[in-house]
């Protein structure tokens, strides 16, 4: 099975920077905006969860911490799976995990249930971030930087879009009903898109060519460059921990309301694009 998937003679090839490359980018961007909801929904529903389970902010914030644990593991583990099996199967699998996690959260009765489910949500969301960026980079040469940046921005678009939508849902529904709505939206959009995503390969690309181009970056080895990027990512997330995770709950506590908190979060992440 693996050999058949990786055999270039049985997989449709796509010319780099072609119309099909851009169509693939649009599909990956769309599924990224929808699929990374797992990173942002918990931020908006955190005040409601604090009330329902009678917990303080410190304990409630563990929900986002476990999400990031899953997100980190997912980028690595699912990236390895995509290297072996292609993009289509992992995306379908991640969609199933994401939808199932939201549905399972609806019937959760203990806080630790949600902690575990957030790990799965984070892992699923990771599929549409790092692995998607790595995939789309293979289908562009002249516009590779732009293509990767567009896929990377899907997470920020999700952060700008989903909090507003979820806060509007919460005005009329409790958080479990909102989670059910999210599950339906994800299933309705992501499964059809995953059907159109094929395990394509790009023409006119070789690993040696990419490696040669990358060595021009101040003579840094790939491992050194990766370590520096990891450290930069950690530094970025440390700085964003308070505004990204606690801003909605803070606005609720200060009397501004959930809607205002969601708007502040949305503006902040929209600026990140």
Model-derived regions, located:
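Pair of pore-lining "gating" transmembrane helices in MFS-fold secondary transporters
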Residues: 18-41, 119, 222-240
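Residue-level signature of mid-helix packing/kink "hotspots" within the transmembrane helices
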Residues: 40, 67-76, 159-160, 269-273
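Conserved MFS/SLC helix-loop-helix module at the cytosolic interface between two early adjacent transmembrane helices
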Residues: 73-112
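Intracellular juxtamembrane helix-capping segments at the cytosolic ends
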Residues: 127-140
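Helix-loop-helix hairpin linking two adjacent transmembrane segments in secondary transporters
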Residues: 150-201
